[in-house]
């Protein structure tokens, strides 16, 4: 605490502040504080004033020093009462509020708070999911793509979401179009509506069932959404990669140890507090003979095995994953096929980026995906526990039974993968993966009562004939073959734990087939025309250097590096208050940085004294 000219200025630690709207951006300063900061309050002695009048050169120098002191003090003091100009956008409002800055001042180049970027990102974020589940994305690690200073300011603004643009919307549509070409969506809306309506009718008849024994029929919560994502963007996609040589939109993740500046490679490290969950979605993976891309003999062997080993329903083989996984891995080892990893960038004009840093960031994005896939394919046990940790960090119970609606939806869309496994779960049989088989909980799962029509409903003697006729009439699938054998009380319910087990085994199939070729496709978002493809050779040393740099940024262990290309500033939401964008001199920048540095020091001192 310091006393200055009869006014007490107390350095206060940073406290959470909400990002206000543009109509709430007026800040103020009291008349007393305004006077205390005026040049008349620098407390010059009478002798000094006489000397200044007789010695112009000394006067000039001292006034300059006083102005410097004034600037430093002013940059430390927060405005309170006098009306100040509004900030031009919510991002600026956020960072000025969080950093307690005077809106008349430029943004400092130095973080004046006690929070490192990752801590701040995990506590002050407009997207509350990052507060509930602290994590980073692959794109968040690419801090040097445009301007590190902008990335830095975005974090401390509270990660304010920028409005979606027309180009972004078109890009999203193109990604969905490319995904549907390989993974056509099966619309189960009508089936789900029928099941919900039927369940509502039956619920009125089930007044004798104790609440604690009820199996959840309808649940559209986050656990269910994650289950669908794992089933479709992991299990189905990896199976498609084995059977059809390509897949799009595959979920990947890793755990970045910010202290060691490297990704975790053993399951014991996963739960450490310094291990940060990093998630990403790889746009496209191709599985091919790199020296002869037209070679399809591996897939002929895979399909030959599947067609001969498994029964079919509607000309679709019902694959037993317990048998398929070890056999597929053995077949893959007989061929020199490799995975290649591609990121798709959409462009609103028929040209690729000219900025080298943007091109480099895109390259490293593919390196991250390649590295994640490598980590997830090395050891199925590591991947299994990695997925379990992923779900638990999101607050999910991995042993919670999935709702009936989710289970029947997954069965309808992907019965070729899940039917045989669901039979095993229903009968309480092992699936052949010991980490799951040894820990799966035996919980009664009522997969029978809800699959009746109200006109023939019975708890004691369920009759499914009319129900099966009704649901088969919706889309013509042989439900009598894929549903009837499952209509019982299951001994082991379907859970996130089960999905983690199968996903980890599918990753491991590719253990010896990870390639080093990555690429970035640039496509015109209006037509999907391929404008250019940049091909890269994965280099671990180069990648690790990038990981270390990103780790130091998020750990607050290095200074941020502003862009040298000031033409980029015109696209930045912080331009109007950025000293770099304003072309300020080094001396001016340093002077305006001293105050925030002092504020940071005082914050740290006060925090230490309280701790």
Swiss-Prot record:
One of its GO terms (cellular component) is nucleus. Binds 1 [4Fe-4S] cluster. Its cofactor is Mg(2+); [4Fe-4S] cluster. It comes from the Eukaryota. Residues 21-35 have a biased composition (Basic and acidic residues). Its EC number is 3.1.-.-. It holds the Pfam family Exo5. [4Fe-4S] cluster binds at residues 147, 569, 572, 578. It is found in: Mitochondrion. Residues 19-42 are annotated as: Disordered. InterPro entries: EXOV. Single strand DNA specific 5'exonuclease involved in mitochondrial DNA replication and recombination. Releases dinucleotides as main products of catalysis. Has the capacity to slide across 5'double-stranded DNA or 5'RNA sequences and resumes cutting two nucleotides downstream of the double-stranded-to-single-stranded junction or RNA-to-DNA junction, respectively. Belongs to the EXO5 family. This is Exonuclease V, mitochondrial. The gene is EXO5.
């Amino acid at each position: 605490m310091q006393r200055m000219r009869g006014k007490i200025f107390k350095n206060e630690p940073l406290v959470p502040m909400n990002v206000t709207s543009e109509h709430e951006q007026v800040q103020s300063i009291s008349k007393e504080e305004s006077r205390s900061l005026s040049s008349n309050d620098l407390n010059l002695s009478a002798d000094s004033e006489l000397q200044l009048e007789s010695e112009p050169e000394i006067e000039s120098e001292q006034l300059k020093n006083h102005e410097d002191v004034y600037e430093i003090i002013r940059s430390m003091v927060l405005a309170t009462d006098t009306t100040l100009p509004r900030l031009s956008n919510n991002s600026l409002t956020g960072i000025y509020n969080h950093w307690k800055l005077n809106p008349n001042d430029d943004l400092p180049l130095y973080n004046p708070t006690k929070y490192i970027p990752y801590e701040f990102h995990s506590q002050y974020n407009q997207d509350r999911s990052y507060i509930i589940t602290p994590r980073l994305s692959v794109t968040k690690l690419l801090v040097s793509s445009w301007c590190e200073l902008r990335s830095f300011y975005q974090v401390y603004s509270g990660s304010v979401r920028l409005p979606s643009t027309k180009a972004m919307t078109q890009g999203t549509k193109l990604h969905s179009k490319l995904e549907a070409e390989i993974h056509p969506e099966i619309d189960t809306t009508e089936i789900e509506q029928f099941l919900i309506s039927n369940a509502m009718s039956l619920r009125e008849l089930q007044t004798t069932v104790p609440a604690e024994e009820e199996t959840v029929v309808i649940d559209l919560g986050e656990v269910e959404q994650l289950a669908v994502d794992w089933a479709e963007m992991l299990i189905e996609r990896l199976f498609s990669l084995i059977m059809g040589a390509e897949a799009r939109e595959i979920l990947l993740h890793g755990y970045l140890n910010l202290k060691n500046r490297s990704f975790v490679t053993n399951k014991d490290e996963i739960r450490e507090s310094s291990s940060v969950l990093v998630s990403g979605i790889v746009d496209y993976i191709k599985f091919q003979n790199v020296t002869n891309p037209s070679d399809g003999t591996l897939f002929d062997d895979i399909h030959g095995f599947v067609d001969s080993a498994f029964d079919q329903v509607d000309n679709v083989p019902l694959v037993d994953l317990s048998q398929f996984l070890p056999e597929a891995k053995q077949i893959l080892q007989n061929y020199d096929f490799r995975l290649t990893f591609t990121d798709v960038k959409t462009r609103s004009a028929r040209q690729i980026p000219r900025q080298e840093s943007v091109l480099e960031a895109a390259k490293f994005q593919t390196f991250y995906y390649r590295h994640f896939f490598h980590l997830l394919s090395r050891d199925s046990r590591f991947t299994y526990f990695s997925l379990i940790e992923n779900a638990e960090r999101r607050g999910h119970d991995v042993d919670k039974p999935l709702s009936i609606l989710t289970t029947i939806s997954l069965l309808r869309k992907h019965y070729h993968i899940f039917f045989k496994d669901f039979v095993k779960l229903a009968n309480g049989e092992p699936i052949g993966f010991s980490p799951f088989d040894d820990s799966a909980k035996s919980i009664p799962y009522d997969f029978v009562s809800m699959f009746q029509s109200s006109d023939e409903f019975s708890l004691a003697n369920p009759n499914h004939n009319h129900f099966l006729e009704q649901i088969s009439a919706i889309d013509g699938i042989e439900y009598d073959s894929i549903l009837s054998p499952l209509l019982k009380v299951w001994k082991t319910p379907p859970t996130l734990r089960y999905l983690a087990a199968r996903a980890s085994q599918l990753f491991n199939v590719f253990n010896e087939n990870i390639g080093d070729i990555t690429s970035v496709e640039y496509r015109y978002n209006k037509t999907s025309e391929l404008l250019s493809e940049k091909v890269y050779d994965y280099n671990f040393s180069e990648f690790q250097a990038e990981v270390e740099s990103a780790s130091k940024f998020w750990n607050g262990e290095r200074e941020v590096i502003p862009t040298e290309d000031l033409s980029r500033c015109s696209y930045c939401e912080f331009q109007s208050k950025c000293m770099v964008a304003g072309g300020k001199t080094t001396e001016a920048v340093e002077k305006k940085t001293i105050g925030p540095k002092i504020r940071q020091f005082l914050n740290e001192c006060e925090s230490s004294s309280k701790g």
